[in-house]
Amino acid sequence: MQAVWMILSSFLFATMGVCVKYASAYFNSSELVFYRGVLGVLFMAAYARASGSSLRTRVPAMHAWRSVIGVMSLSAWFYAIAHLPLATAMTLNYMSSVWIAAFLVGGALMLGKPGKKGPSQGPLVLAILASFAGVVLLLRPAMDQNQAFAGLIGLMSGLGAAFAYMQVMAISRLGEPETRTVFYFAVGTAVAGALGMGVMGVSPWNWQHALWLPPLGILASLGQLTMTRAYSMSENHRGTLMVANLQYSGIVFAALYGLILFGDNIPLVGWAGMALIIVSAIAATVLRARAAPDAPAEEH
């Protein structure tokens, strides 16, 4: 059953990407971030009240720092969705597992522990190199279409997501529940979006265009909650790994959405790069789980 919950979560995140792509034609990135945050706050506050969860935290500074990193990643992801094929933007954002694996390898090398440099790191290094080779293949068509900058921003969204995830790991080790973490991230998102709107301005309001805004926060919150449910139902390490790898089904959903709704034309070399990233990211997830077997669910 946990597999169904994770596939549902991936579907919800991909559907949120569709809403972002449509809404980006009428609203700037700061507005999208703001509405995603405000609606997320309302939804998570209602959920916490219904479930009897307290939103009072002992580590506000850690939540604030997580929000800063997360907002940067989210803004970059929304920009990439607006300017790249949906599946391409989703794939680049889902590279957070690869970035985390790269951090683990880099940390082992910096610590200078001989045991960490041995064969145990070899497969992880190969997975990282394969993933970045996939990025080159994936972004090659984008460069031909003058989308190189958007591709770079999309790549940075995955890097930011990796930093945010490591902060979530630190927060979870202090006993903070997922509901509270998601709530305070939504608060930070709303505040950052409001500040951004003060700089970038507010777009003309049209109720037909605004219909794309409510799903942003709702789908994101539902996606995170169903992902958490999937992880919580995993009874052993193998089940957790299966759930973690099923998150990449979101790329498949995004590809289908892109073909059906937006007519995205991704050349064969782009599909090959996407497949290589998915395979290497799954490998990195499995190998990374050995270093952090009790890590919390990743957020998007």
PLM segments and residue spans:
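Specific alpha-helical transmembrane segments that line the substrate/conduction pathway
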Residues: 31-34, 38, 81-116, 240-257
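Transmembrane alpha-helices of multi-pass small-molecule transport proteins
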Residues: 2, 27-72, 100-103, 160-164, ...
